[in-house]
Amino acid sequence: FDRIRVSDYEPAFDAAIAVSRAEIDAIVNNPAKPTFNNTIVALDRQGRLLSRVEGIFFNLLEADATPEMQQVAENVQPKLTALSNDISLNPQLFERVKAVYEHPGWFLSKEDKKLLEETYNGFVRSGANLSDEDKELYRQYSTELSELSLRFSHNVLAATNAFTINITDPAQVAELPDFVRDGMAAEAKARGEQGWTVTLQAPSYVPFMEYSTNRELKEKLWRASNSLCLGGEFDNTENIKRMVNLRLKIANLLGYPTYADYVLADRMAENAQTVNAFLGELLARTKEYAVKDYNTIGEYARSQGFEGEVMPWDMAYYSEKYRHEKYELNEELVKPYLQLDSVKRGVFLLANKLYGLNFT
């Protein structure tokens, strides 16, 4: 991966998309009668080069979303959405899929039948059966939704990265475990700051909330984390409203009353009513235990000299202390066993035992 430059990604996407389009054209223009192999299997195998490029890029984007990587994502996302729509809304291609679906033959295995069913349903759920007018609406809605989803994610990341608290008083970090303090010092150094810096990123936020006794700073962190993208420069309110509206329009176009019903139609739950019933039952069965756990932590906090109401930003600290005292669980003692090299060895060993794979 160290040989890949950011400037390599967009040309790689363009080349892989071109290959995918050529593969689709070959299926559509095949003069032979549609069969499971020349249509369904061919569809399943197309796009593998693009999948490799997407897998590398989007995994690295999640891990290290630099402004340059985000710009690449903004540039390629419309192209990926256009390709997806051009495939699912291609009438000639769908006719071939439909022909195989309606006359599959007796020789298909269970796995083949599953692939055929999922391929056909995937086209239908992506607008293949819509009228030409509705197909154009579907294309517009899905394109805008894709752009909004990317903007939403970028705002969340930008807002998360924008909020930090820098501490220069050694007394305010003296109580923290070494691994927390060292991480904060490294963060400060990376930002060109003095002292120690805590951010909203989980590796920084979570241990600070668990080990710091500074309630004022923890309240600021908690409120910032729980109001992310609510107002300000990175506000996502209008994006969310528009995304919800577009999802409803897509669901209605495809014959579903809600987007939840559309998503659940090919899943075990099947519809929103089933999920709502499950959630209602889950709430009824678990609320008592959640309240009990909350009260237990509150009582423990008061036994430690805490006065007043235990607030949300207090829970992580007293929960961690309670676990350590009652169950002798100490995260700091476990960390030496979870160094990167140790974890990699463990993962590779497990892969060898389960699947016979060897990594060199």
Where are the language model's segments positioned?
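Membrane-entry segments of alpha-helical transmembrane domains in multi-pass membrane proteins
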Residues: 2-12, 36-40, 233-236, 275-282, ...
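Active-site-proximal, well-structured secondary-structure segments within enzyme catalytic domains
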Residues: 115-116, 139, 144-147, 154, ...
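Active-site-adjacent "gating/activation" loops or surface patches in catalytic cores
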Residues: 190-228, 315
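N-terminal helix-rich structural modules
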Residues: 1-176
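Second-shell loop/turn segments in exported
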Residues: 2-10, 123-127, 204-211, 228-233, ...
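Membrane-interfacial helix termini and the short, flexible loops that connect transmembrane helices
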Residues: 27-32, 60-65, 212, 220-221, ...
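Amphipathic alpha-helical coiled-coil segments and their boundaries
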Residues: 36-39, 116, 123, 134, ...
